Swiss-Prot record:
Function: Regulates membrane-cell wall junctions and localized cell wall deposition. Required for establishment of the Casparian strip membrane domain (CSD) and the subsequent formation of Casparian strips, a cell wall modification of the root endodermis that determines an apoplastic barrier between the intraorganismal apoplasm and the extraorganismal apoplasm and prevents lateral diffusion.
The keyword Transmembrane appears for this protein: yes
Sites where a glycan is attached: N152
Topological type in the membrane: Multi-pass membrane protein
Pfam families referenced in this protein's UniProt entry, alphabetically: CASP_dom
Major subcellular site: membrane
Location in the cell: Cell membrane
GO biological process: cell wall modification; cell-cell junction assembly
Name of this protein: Casparian strip membrane protein 2
Assembly and binders: Homodimer and heterodimers.
Family the UniProt entry places it in: Belongs to the Casparian strip membrane proteins (CASP) family.
PANTHER family in alphabetical order: CASP-LIKE PROTEIN, CASP-LIKE PROTEIN 1U1
Length: 199
């Protein structure tokens, strides 16, 4: 130091580096983006499930066939409402399709707010109920469709699908569509559980 100088020299601290700013990572944004992707896929799957559930209900509900030959006293006709199992199937698949339509706003909330656990938890509970109803209706209808195709010799139930081909074809298509809906529901439950697990 020079004599008479009023200047004081202060050495810089070694712990502070010049010209660097701390980097701020944004893990929440990445996590939110990941959950948002799951929510968008959930919404798309719900739209697909609506289509398959409505197709199953419509196919079964319009499955009636009248054979071209008839007698003076009998007209040979097969319709879904002849069997209570098929009536249950149509009602159950209509309920499932209605639930899926009503669940779309909750799926949209999950897209807008991917970190919200409430809508996901509600969807898991209601999806499980809808999956159970869907599986019950599909399994019951599948048993009747099997009997219509193959009959049962032990109880003398004859196969009717050789005569009522269109009726059986529509019923079989409805059962296949219902089981596709079951598979979509399983994917929806896995997605929702996965999103909640990483919450």
């Amino acid at each position: 130091m020079m004599r008479g100088s009023t200047e004081i020299d202060m050495p810089e601290s070694s712990s502070v580096s010049k010209g660097t700013a701390p980097l701020i990572a944004a893990p929440m944004k990445e996590k939110g983006g990941y959950k948002k992707g799951i929510a968008i896929f959930d919404f798309i799957l719900r739209l697909a499930a609506i289509a398959t559930a409505l197709a199953a209900a419509a196919s079964m509900g319009t499955s009636d066939e009248t054979l071209p030959f008839f007698t003076q006293f009998f007209q040979f006709q097969a319709s879904y409402d002849d069997l209570p199992t098929f009536q249950f199937f149509v009602i159950a698949m209509a309920i499932v399709a209605g639930y899926l339509v009503l669940s779309l706003p909750f799926s949209i909330v999950a897209i807008v707010r991917p970190h919200a656990a409430g809508p996901r938890l509600l969807l898991i509970i209601l999806d499980t109920v809808a999956l159970t109803l869907n599986t019950a209706a599909g399994a019951a209808a599948a048993a009747i469709v099997y009997l219509a195709h193959n009959g049962n010799s032990s109880t003398n139930w004859l196969a009717i699908c050789q005569q009522f081909g269109d009726f059986c074809q529509k019923n079989s298509g409805a059962v296949v569509a219902s089981f596709i809906t079951v598979v979509i529901f399983v994917f929806l439950l896995v997605l929702s559980a996965f999103a909640l697990r990483r919450h």
